């Protein structure tokens, strides 16, 4: 019988959990306090930057959410790098792309709903798309078969199922975004906000599953 695999890097695991947990708490807070301003069905998470919290903007809080998730992901990246497993470089590059994309999304706002596309808005959209593709790709590379005593092997099936769900959600969100561009916001048929929140939930669950062996 194989002995249980030791924790890869408890310090990185705790930092990752802290960052991811903070991001989740902030996202719940934004949903609760801005439910009357931003539709969770039709509007994306990024549009919380235009919400109002009392006399102030919700943009700083949204930025902190993105930065916290990015920090947690960087900690996961560092923990995986410490494992020194085959394929680590590719996984770290993809997680780096995911983390950088989150950073850009937190600093560069999306275009307001119904307004003309701006360069900043396009940068935000491209960063978000790249990030959401990079994370499940990293998960698939991390759980590639043929790696003996890999800390992530016991969770391989779960990680891959979540990564598949993430890719599927990205496809739906991207398809809905293209339809909205073609038909216009007034004729929007796909509930982008709802599917993006599903994608966010899947990706957070995926991150937490990937973090577990670090602890």
Please place each PLM-identified region on the residue numbering:
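Internal transmembrane alpha-helix with an interfacial aromatic "cap," most often the third helix
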Residues: 64-93, 136-150
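Membrane-proximal helix-loop-helix units in multi-pass membrane proteins
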Residues: 101-152
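N-terminal signal-anchor transmembrane alpha helix
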Residues: 7-33
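Interfacial segments of alpha-helical transmembrane regions
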Residues: 10-18, 84-97, 154-166
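Transmembrane alpha-helix entry/boundary detector in multi-pass membrane proteins
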Residues: 57-62, 88-91, 116-133, 195
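C-terminal ends of transmembrane alpha-helices
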Residues: 26-36, 40, 100-115, 170-188
